[in-house]
């Protein structure tokens, strides 16, 4: 039995140049686990609290020294001597120590950093890769990468409302093949943009961020790039969206493409998109508090396309249960820092999968070189992962880890492919 001997934390930088928390956990057998915490740009109002210092004279108020101090001064003394394999008790001890419903005292960034570092240390102590430690012998499904190759919304400085336009290589036989297809489309998209005199500047997640006249124009450009790369839209490579609609929901209406639209009008818009394009997934199509609109949308097109709750569910089992009971949405986006501990994340995934919801393991727009989510995706047989474009090392790090996992699994590896999207009829 390996016990927790010491816990240390520090401030490091994320991919946007903002501070974040990194934690190291030392076990009694000498093994060390390390984890760094991501940060979102478009955050749901129901997410656990990311503790920032607020000192405008240091990192423009975005320092995380308070969270670092919480790890060193409060969490560490409370966890010394715990069995590192008892993840649930460790996470619960931190939740109890915090004592708030949203981890607002210690900070979800402090608690999550320790939670993930403990798991990494325990896996090292067991001489197992993290995905096998967490998922056991059944952890063998490689996820379809939802690759964000064109950015709009709060991830880019452009007139495109939808935040992410993604490609999903559903027709590939293996993860490595699917990744290659995605990379080839990404480079072909750059060539298409250059040919049309459009910007090839990058957004937060490595996707291109051109100024386009409409959201449909973005989908048309991506389909052109897919064809130029030698693939067939809908058969080889499908499309997916993250609308992040809470970002443009103002005063009871969706401020979309220059108009103020109702939930019913937005639903009609999405129904047209699903009819016109090979869309397998639409994330956050409506506001995080618009449960009535979400229910209507699910009833309208939920049998044809994956409808993903990100801001709606914030990886929270309580909010997810509300969705399940009302048959609202049909997929859960899984972001470890939304709920703030590994145990609660795995509980949410388990609840979703038992209830017939698909799951997508996801990064945040502010990322680090930490690859824990790649292992979580395989450990939970999620079938899908969102970790940005095949560019920028903080995104590519996760893809490279999945390549290593696929190689290690060898003949046992199975690529989720088209089966990850059971509602897609294209």
Curated annotation (Swiss-Prot):
Organism annotation: Paenarthrobacter aurescens (strain TC1)
Localization annotation: Cytoplasm; Secreted; Cell surface
Annotated metabolic or biological route of this protein: Carbohydrate degradation; glycolysis; pyruvate from D-glyceraldehyde 3-phosphate: step 4/5
TM ranges: none
Cofactor info, note text: Binds a second Mg(2+) ion via substrate during catalysis.
An annotated GO BP: glycolytic process
Entry keywords, A to Z: Cytoplasm, Glycolysis, Lyase, Magnesium, Metal-binding, Secreted
Cofactors demanded by this protein: Mg(2+)
InterPro entries xref list: Enolase, Enolase-like_C_sf, Enolase-like_N, Enolase_C, Enolase_CS, Enolase_N
Annotated SMART domains: Enolase_C, Enolase_N
Protein name per the record: Enolase
Family to which the UniProt record says this protein belongs: Belongs to the enolase family.
GO MF annotation: an example: phosphopyruvate hydratase activity
Domain of life: Bacteria
Keyword Endoplasmic reticulum included in the entry's annotation: no
Underlying gene: eno
């Amino acid at each position: 039995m390996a016990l927790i001997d010491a816990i240390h934390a520090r401030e490091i930088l994320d991919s946007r140049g903002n501070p974040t928390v990194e934690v190291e956990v030392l076990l009694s057998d000498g093994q060390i686990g390390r984890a760094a915490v991501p940060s979102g740009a478009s955050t749901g109002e129901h997410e656990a609290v990311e503790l920032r210092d607020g000192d405008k004279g240091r990192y423009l108020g975005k320092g995380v020294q308070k969270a670092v101090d919480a790890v060193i001064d409060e969490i560490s003394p409370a966890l010394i001597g715990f069995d590192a394999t008892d993840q649930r008790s460790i996470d619960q001890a931190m939740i109890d120590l915090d004592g708030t419903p949203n981890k607002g005292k210690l900070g979800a960034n402090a608690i999550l950093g320790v939670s993930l570092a403990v798991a990494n240390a325990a896996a090292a102590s067991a001489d197992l890769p993290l995905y096998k430690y967490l998922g056991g012998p059944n952890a063998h499904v490689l996820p379809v990468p939802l690759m964000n190759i064109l950015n709009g919304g709060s991830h880019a400085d452009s007139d495109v409302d939808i935040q992410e336009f993604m490609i999903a290589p559903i027709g590939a036989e293996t993860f490595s093949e699917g990744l290659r297809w995605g990379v080839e489309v990404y480079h072909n998209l750059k060539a298409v943009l250059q040919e049309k005199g459009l910007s090839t500047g990058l957004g937060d997640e490595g996707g291109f961020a051109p100024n386009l006249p409409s959201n449909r124009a973005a989908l048309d450009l991506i389909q052109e790039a897919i064809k130029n790369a030698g693939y067939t839209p809908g058969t080889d490579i499908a499309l997916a969206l993250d609308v992040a609609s809470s970002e443009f929901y103002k005063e009871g209406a969706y401020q979309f493409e220059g108009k103020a639209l109702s939930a019913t009008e937005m639903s009609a818009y999405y129904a047209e998109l699903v009819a016109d394009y090979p869309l397998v997934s639409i994330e956050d199509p409506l506001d995080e508090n618009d449960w009535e609109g979400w229910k209507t949308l699910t009833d309208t097109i939920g049998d044809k396309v994956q409808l993903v709750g990100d801001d709606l569910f914030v990886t929270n089992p309580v909010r997810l249960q509300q969705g399940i009971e009302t048959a609202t949405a049909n997929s859960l986006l899984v972001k470890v820092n939304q709920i703030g501990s590994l145990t609660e994340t795995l509980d949410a995934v388990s609840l979703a999968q038992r209830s017939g919801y698909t799951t997508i393991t996801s990064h945040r727009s502010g990322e680090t070189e930490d690859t824990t989510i790649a292992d979580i995706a395989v450990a939970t047989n999620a079938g899908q992962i969102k970790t940005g474009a095949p560019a920028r090392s903080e995104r590519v790090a996760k893809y490279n880890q999945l390549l290593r996992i696929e190689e290690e699994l060898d003949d046992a590896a199975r690529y989720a492919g088209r089966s990850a999207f059971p509602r897609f009829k294209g």
